[in-house]
């Protein structure tokens, strides 16, 4: 959810840049909406909480209220699911009802784009921006691939103070480490991660690390890895973000993100923090690592094995092709670009 919404911001920014007088509304689940507070390209965040998503009648009621209160000139249905199509169903007088080509979208969307075509080799941001193309009928579109998050100076200052109290020395680099994942199949081999972190600590004596994890299994996993590393003083295991905006403030106060691909990496890129991420076979790096002005690199099985060889291997074997040596070589190459 975080990654999808983050990459969608480039479309919001493209629309605001192209139509500065337009009012841009962004529809999101409530649990991630706080990230987009204060965004200059988003005039209003419309949220759906659990009680508004279910039962279905409650969802329909909320969609009807939103569409009838706002009477939109343009609806861009980025997901184009049966549920999201109700925005267009209740807005048949809206001149531009834009979305994806699917079998069931023909009747309700009057501009459809194939953002998941097998012929596309573009990243997710570029695919999202295809949805702005029908608006070229109004005026030329000024596209941007930049997606940004905005924190207040006070938010960043408060979290920096907390980090200092926990022992962070801002005279030295601070790495945010995506050491674990919510979904087990997306997590790089734990022993490989331990080997790589040990080598970073050995060869970069000034680097400090903060492990990023959520409560529950992720925290348990992160603390086990910390113990396996020998509980080094340079890893601050107890620095925790209690909300998404605090996670953003944590990212904003770090020098670099390294680790498993996920929402925190997208947040880092949106805050112009450089990164290097490890992509599982189930997450296409070419799609989910968008290129823009921020240094963001990564590694996936596609960088190592040709498709015909991957076709003969199990998921685990493909993931294991990303060895600590390959990760370290590419990580250090990325770090050299920064220095």
Predicted regions and their residues:
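Catalytic machinery of carbohydrate-active enzymes
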Residues: 1-339
């Amino acid at each position: 959810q975080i990654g999808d919404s983050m990459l969608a911001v480039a479309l919001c920014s493209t629309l605001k840049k192209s139509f500065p007088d337009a009012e841009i509304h962004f529809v999101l689940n409530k649990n991630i909406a706080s990230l987009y507070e204060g965004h200059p390209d988003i005039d209003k965040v419309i949220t759906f909480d659990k009680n508004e998503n279910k039962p279905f009648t409650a969802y329909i009621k909320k969609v009807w209220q939103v569409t009838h209160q706002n009477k939109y000139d343009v609806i861009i249905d980025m997901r184009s699911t049966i549920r999201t199509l109700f925005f267009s169903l209740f807005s048949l007088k809206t001149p531009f009802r834009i979305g994806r080509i699917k079998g069931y979208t023909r009747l309700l969307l009057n501009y459809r784009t194939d953002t998941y075509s097998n012929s596309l080799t573009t990243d997710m941001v570029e695919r999202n921006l295809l949805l702005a193309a029908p608006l070229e009928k109004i005026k030329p579109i000024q596209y941007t691939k930049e997606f940004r998050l905005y924190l207040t100076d006070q938010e960043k200052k408060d979290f920096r103070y907390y980090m200092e109290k926990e022992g962070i020395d801002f005279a030295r680099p601070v790495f945010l480490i995506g050491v674990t994942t919510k979904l087990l199949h997306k997590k790089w081999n734990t022993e490989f991660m331990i080997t790589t972190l040990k080598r970073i600590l050995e060869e970069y004596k000034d680097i400090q690390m903060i492990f990023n994890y959520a409560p529950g299994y992720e925290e348990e996993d992160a603390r086990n890895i910390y113990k396996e590393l020998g509980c080094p003083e340079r890893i601050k295991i107890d620095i925790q973000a209690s909300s998404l905006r605090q996670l953003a403030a944590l990212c904003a106060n770090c020098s670099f993100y390294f680790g498993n691909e996920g929402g925190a990496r997208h947040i880092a890129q949106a805050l112009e923090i450089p990164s290097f991420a490890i992509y599982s076979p189930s997450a296409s790096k070419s799609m989910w690592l968008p290129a823009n002005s921020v240094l963001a690199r990564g590694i996936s099985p596609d960088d190592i094995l040709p498709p015909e060889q991957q076709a003969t291997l199990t998921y685990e074997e493909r993931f294991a092709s990303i060895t600590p040596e390959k990760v370290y070589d590419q990580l250090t190459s990325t770090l050299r670009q920064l220095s």
